[in-house]
UniProtKB/Swiss-Prot annotation:
It comes from Sulfurimonas denitrificans (strain ATCC 33889 / DSM 1251). The lineage of its organism: Bacteria, Pseudomonadati, Campylobacterota, Epsilonproteobacteria, Campylobacterales. SUPFAM superfamilies: Class II aaRS and biotin synthetases (SSF55681), GAD domain-like (SSF55261), Nucleic acid-binding proteins (SSF50249). This is Aspartate--tRNA(Asp/Asn) ligase. ATP binds at R219, D220, E221, Q228, E478, G530, F531, D532, R533. Keywords: Aminoacyl-tRNA synthetase, ATP-binding, Cytoplasm, Ligase, Nucleotide-binding, Protein biosynthesis. It is found in: Cytoplasm. The keyword rRNA processing does not apply. Gene3D superfamilies: Bira Bifunctional Protein, Domain 2 (3.30.930.10), GAD-like domain (3.30.1360.30), Nucleic acid-binding proteins (2.40.50.140).
Length: 580
């Protein structure tokens, strides 16, 4: 039907007869000559309908309104002098229409295609209209290119694409499962997979050696900008490998996917140990586009003349006193503004926030009176203070201090007066050497998941046991991660016991895995990359909803289809379900 897409045409096509198809983006009648901006997936081009060129086409054009579906035939010509539109890729040319067909009419649309000021609820209700915006098409073109690149590079490296079940057993991995009632097995339920984790391990036991899948996953959890109840991950597993082997494949995969989207990234990526990330950046997903590294000053504060600080400093195994130097902040923020930073960190458990300012005549601030001249000089030297700098201090329980000082670091870096993060940079970092366990409310939990291989279980403090686990972080966002897995039944049973999962519960939930590990499971490991998050970052969107064709809202509902919805009583009866 068509010979070209709109933006395929240029001055090189002058004089050619072409056939275009798309939607009427806008309509203008200028003294008898009608101009129509035709839009297709590639962009816009101007159609000119002059009664002197084609009376029939002009007559048809006079009845056209926004979003009518058109097919136009005509010749490409240069626009007249002074009539070009530099904002359009095709702004130097137009199509002189000889034949025009209205393939379909449109009701009045609820918003102009491409309008960025439309509320999200309206956009999602009419998502199919929003998708007509060529910029939306470009986002999904990149997504398609990245998926193809992922498949190609993994295929080249000997990986086999295998689909794992969507209807599976409920084995909660931290979030709640989406449950599917069985009609055949009354009172029993399937679960939608939170990940293909156990199935891909079983594929390794089955000798498949190298597996991948672009997998749909489901988690019934509270949503935010970078989460959806259903999401896509690029899932990879390999046998007879170590951590280095897995990370090498992950880097090859990311280089290929970014390259397909026109972005060059260079491996190998930086690495940082989990505990260093927490001590320096207050986060296990640090944004390294800017420095702002926290420094430990607990030894200096232990000698100060302030009982609050000295009491905190007496317990360095459980407490921290951290300093965050912000270059030039004294030249940017007033004292009143710096006081608002204290209000910010109080939201996250801080009891207060101290600060010093580096002036021409030395270090100044309300806390300076508590320190000796020697310790003031030591602070200046250790922190590398220069005139105009401000240093902020956080003190208290180490996890609380890490959290609020890490958040303060991001808050300051992203402040409109600082803008420390390069919006065009892609700064990758591997976070490695994660603790195997964490203790929360007296309960032992797996920091990643219970199938992760520990480095050494012979430690007095369970929180000191490290795992062979690794996360890949990009610009402060966790893209994904993985681990070397437990491949021996005895070790897996021991880890379950440490997590408080008894023998009977382990057999009920994971008996199939434990059975498989009895039959010569190979050493194996893998990773998964959040595809939606990855595309959100590549295409510089603020939410993964912008890179999913038909996303859910933050309430996990679909405004377009009105899902979830009530179902027929007959369906409930067949599923043996009664509603209260």
């Amino acid at each position: 039907m068509r010979s070209h897409y709109c933006t395929e045409l240029s001055e090189a096509n002058i004089g050619q007869e072409v056939v275009l198809a798309g939607w009427a983006n806008s309509y203008r009648d200028h003294g008898g000559i009608i101009f129509i901006d035709l839009r297709d997936k590639s962009g816009l081009i101007q159609l000119t309908c002059d009664p002197e060129d084609s009376a029939s086409s002009h007559k048809i054009a006079s009845s056209i309104r926004d979003e009518f579906v058109l097919v136009a035939k005509g010749k490409v010509r240069l626009r007249g002098e002074g009539l070009t539109n530099p904002r359009l890729k095709t702004g130097a040319i137009e199509i002189v229409v000889s034949e025009l067909t209205i393939e379909n009419r449109s009701a009045a649309v609820p918003f102009v295609i491409g309008d960025k000021n439309v509320g999200e609820e309206t956009r999602l209700k009419y998502r199919y209209l929003e998708l007509r915006d060529p910029s939306m098409y470009e986002t999904f073109r990149l997504r398609s290119k990245a998926a193809i690149a992922a498949r190609n590079i993994l295929d080249e490296n000997g990986f086999l694409e295998v689909e794992t079940p969507i209807l599976t057993k409920s084995t909660p991995e931290g979030a709640r499962d989406y449950l599917v009632p069985s009609r055949v097995h009354s009172g029993e339920f399937y679960a939608l997979p939170q990940s293909p984790q156990l199935f891909k391990q079983l594929l390794m036991v089955g000798g498949f050696d190298r597996y991948f899948q672009i997998a749909k996953c489901f988690r019934d959890e509270d949503l935010r900008a970078d989460r959806q109840p259903e999401f896509t991950q690029i899932d990879v597993e390999m046998s007879f490998c170590n951590q280095e082997d897995v990370m090498l494949i992950a880097e090859k995969l990311l280089v290929s996917m970014f390259g397909a989207c026109g972005v060059e990234i260079k491996p190998p990526f930086n690495r940082i140990a989990y505990r260093d990330a927490m001590e320096w950046y207050g986060s296990d997903k640090p944004d390294l586009r800017y420095d702002l590294k926290m420094v430990d000053v607990i030894d200096i504060f232990e000698r100060c003349d302030n009982e609050i600080f000295t009491n905190i400093a007496k317990q360095p195994h459980k407490n921290r006193i951290k300093a965050l130097r912000v270059p030039g902040a004294d030249l940017v923020f007033s004292k009143r503004e710096m006081k608002t930073f204290e209000d910010f960190v109080r939201q996250f458990g801080a009891q207060g926030l101290g600060y010093f300012q580096m002036k021409e005549d030395g270090l100044k601030g309300p806390l300076i009176k508590f320190f000796s001249d020697a310790d003031i000089a030591l602070l200046v030297d250790r922190l590398g203070m220069k005139v105009g700098d401000v240093v902020f201090f956080g003190a208290g329980d180490k996890k609380t201090v890490w959290d609020y000082m890490g958040r303060l670091r991001i808050f300051i870096a992203e402040h409109e007066r600082m803008n420390l993060a390069d919006k065009d940079a892609f700064e990758f970092v591997w976070v490695v050497d994660f603790p195997m366990f964490e203790v929360e409310d007296g309960r032992v939990k797996a920091l990643h998941h219970p199938f992760t291989q520990p480095k050494d279980t012979d430690k007095d403090d369970i929180e000191e046991i490290d795992s062979i686990a690794y996360d890949i972080v990009l610009n402060g966002t966790e893209l994904g991660g993985g681990s070397i897995r437990i491949h021996k039944e005895e070790m897996q049973e021991e880890i379950f016991k440490l997590l408080g999962i008894g023998e009977e519960e382990a057999k009920e939930k994971f008996g199939f895995l434990l059975d498989a590990l009895k039959f010569g499971a190979p050493p194996h490991g893998g990773f998964a990359i959040g595809f939606d998050r990855l595309m959100m970052l590549i295409s510089k969107k603020s939410s993964i909803r912008d890179v999913i064709a038909f996303p859910k809202t933050q309430k996990a509902s679909c405004i377009l289809t009105k899902a979830p919805s009530e179902v027929d009583a007959t369906q409930l009866r067949d599923l043996h379900i009664k509603l209260r």
